[in-house]
């Protein structure tokens, strides 16, 4: 497999050639967009490899992590669809797979029996505690050489880009002033 850096070099060369054919191409923006897609794809591939021994895919992992992060380890199918960027049909499939493995349960809300609530089971919590800590060294290695300021700025800039994407795609509910930067 070709290294990510080699692919990035090929992308840079390709965009430079494309500028000759389409001079009005916003080259910096095109390079940044493609660079983010390439890095994102590589991150996703790495995560999928880490999840494979646990027989999970990325969407199932996101679902478990979202539930794990909730104060009561529960959510609704709609919230899960929104967070994981999955449609209702695929979220049903994800839920079925996780229920079958005993990692989550589906039930009615105590407040409204018509409302479905998805809860993480103790087995789901144990799986998260087993598989997440081994991811830490790789995560830290990816950001080696980044100062705390670099990481803070990257987070701020990505949030700013997310805000602009929301605005451009008709999802203006994001308020840039209230977005919190992470460490």
PLM regions and their residue ranges:
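N-terminal helix-turn-helix DNA-binding core of bacterial DNA-binding proteins
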Residues: 27, 37, 41, 45-87, ...
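Short, hydrophobic-biased segments on the C-terminal half of alpha helices
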Residues: 77, 95-96
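Charged, amphipathic alpha-helical coiled-coil/dimerization segments
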Residues: 96-156
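C-terminal regulatory/oligomerization modules of transcriptional regulators
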Residues: 1-24, 149-183
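Short amphipathic alpha-helical segments with heptad-repeat character
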Residues: 30-33, 37, 41, 85, ...
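N-terminal leader segment of winged-helix/HTH proteins
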Residues: 1-54
């Amino acid at each position: 497999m070709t290294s990510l850096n080699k692919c990035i070099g090929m992308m840079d060369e390709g965009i430079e050639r494309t500028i000759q054919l389409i001079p009005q191409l916003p080259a910096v923006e095109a390079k940044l967009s493609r660079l983010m897609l390439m890095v994102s794809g590589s991150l996703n591939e790495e995560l999928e490899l880490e999840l494979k021994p646990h027989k999970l895919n990325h969407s199932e992992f996101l679902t478990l992590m979202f539930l794990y992060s909730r104060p009561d380890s529960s959510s609704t199918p709609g919230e899960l669809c929104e967070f994981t960027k999955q449609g209702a049909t695929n979220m049903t499939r994800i839920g079925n797979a996780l229920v079958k493995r005993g990692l989550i349960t589906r039930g009615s809300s105590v407040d409204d029996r018509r409302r479905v609530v998805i809860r993480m089971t103790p087995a789901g919590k144990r799986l998260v505690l087993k598989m997440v800590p081994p991811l830490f060294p790789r995560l830290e290695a990816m950001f080696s050489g980044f100062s705390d300021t670099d990481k803070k700025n990257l987070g701020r800039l990505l949030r700013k880009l997310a805000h602009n994407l929301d605005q451009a795609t008709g999802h203006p509910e994001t308020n840039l002033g209230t977005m919190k930067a992470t460490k």
